[in-house]
Amino acid sequence: MSMTTLVILRFAGIFAAYTGLTVLLPAIMFRRILVGRGLSEQFLMCYTFGNFYIINIVFAVQLLHISGFWALVLFTAVPGILIWSRVNRVSLRELCIKTGIICKKILQGSMGMRGALYRVCNRIKTVLKRSVRLFYYKVICNTLQWILVGAVIIALFWIYGRNLLLTYGYCASDIPVHLNWINEMVRGNLFSDGVYPFGFHCMIYYLHTVFRVDTYAILCVFYLVQVLFIHMVLLAVMKLLCRSLYLPYAGVLVYILGNLWAKQTYSRFGASLPQEFGMIFVIPSVYFLIRFFQTEKEKLKTRETKLLSGCFALAFSLTLAIHFYGTMIAGLCCIGIAVGFCPRFLNKEYFKRIMMTGIISVFLAVLPMGIAFAGGTPLQGSLGWGLSVINGGKSDTEDSEDKTIQDITMEEMAARLNENSKNNIKSNNAKSMQTKRIPAMTETPESTFADKVREIPEKIKKHLEYDGSAYRGIYHKLAGTMVCICGTYRNCSCHSAWSDIYYPAKDYLW
């Protein structure tokens, strides 16, 4: 099997598994609620709940330290069956009794296998008839719109899908860090590097554990799954908010094909990154909030309004559970929507409900991280840095810089002492040099600016006399690392500019 065929099959399998978990499973669970709604709204509701459901299942089993294949399957199936029976008003007790009676008849011989197969075939025929009828009304009767959907998908594969075949790699330097965190989850170590939004990592971990696909292989192809759903969610929201029937397709196609923004804006779509995954749920949160404010005051207590506010809470909590940047953007969008609906936002009934929904959404996202933090897991470095900046204290970056400066100073001092030990013949000079450096290690009065200027020529002369092997080793390692990195991603469109600059250094060094 060629590498191209293998990559295509892997992508198809991961896309089918992810779509089944996040779209098909919620569609079965909430079939009665979704009946009568448009296909776009059904898709948004299913996709939002599906991701929230899977991500929090992983959080639950990880925090309980029972994570594994069977734990994930049971925690997915059992609550799913209970929700399905409750929403669709199906009595599990009666269903189990009927199934038990049929099995008993088969075992007793009062019902033959032909009779049992006849019932199963009739049930399958009924499901197939419903599927054909649904396909006719949703697809055949809207042929032109589905042709435009196909055009959007073809454009996505042309712009982003080619990189899947041309460059089999991560295409982003920070993906190995996320890979390590996911591998630690396999070992039962949630938040191995500290508390951090792990929604993206939970989804990749679920696909790896349940469907037995290597994590590194998922991260190589999952970016295209993200890109497809980003644009499908965008198209669905535009179809729901725009009065024009075909303008949403034109807008999405222009966004895909038009080179309107900086290259970095598009290149990040070529890698499986949490930030881009979290951006998906900014769009549903905007839609559900607009729909909530469009509801009349008399209908605020209806089940439909509660459903819309619940979907908004799930979507907004997903932005916070996956990446903080998505939450910032969603928050700015919510502020803009509140300004647009200012009279209703300031109304007591609307304000009370939307604030309560926002608090619940933040609580749902922070709860797993809060449990881990309360259990003794420290915050990840980026979170600690953000909190220190907010509090006005010294950031972790400054601390690390101070530590680096101290380390460099100690290395220089060690190199100088080593040089002095080699020159045993010039012991008197070595002693004088050591005595000159002793005041640098103790508290001495600060020298004036003129003294420092006069010391510069002497310091330059001393540095030129020292053996620069240690410094050359550092420079060679740094250059070799840059060559390795840029050589690895040379074929990637996201790193072509960097590789063209650094890759010729290979011939010079090696």
Predicted regions and their residues:
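Membrane-embedded, hydrophobic transmembrane alpha-helices
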Residues: M1-I140, C486, R490, C494-Y502
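Juxtamembrane segments of multi-pass membrane glycosylation machinery
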Residues: S2-T4, I66, M203-V225, I230, ...
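Transmembrane signal-anchor helices characteristic of membrane glycosylation enzymes that use polyprenol
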Residues: V23, C141-C171, I360-G376
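Membrane-embedded helix bundles of polyisoprenyl
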Residues: Y47-V58, V149-F157, F200, F222-K299, ...
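Short hydrophobic/aromatic helix or loop-helix immediately within or flanking a transmembrane segment
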Residues: A60, V177, S192-T215
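Membrane-proximal lumenal/periplasmic loop motifs of glycosylation machinery
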Residues: L165-C171, V186-H201
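Periplasmic/ER-lumenal interhelical loops and adjacent helix-loop junctions
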Residues: V195, G199, R353, T357, ...
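Perimembrane helix-loop-helix junctions
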Residues: I329-F363
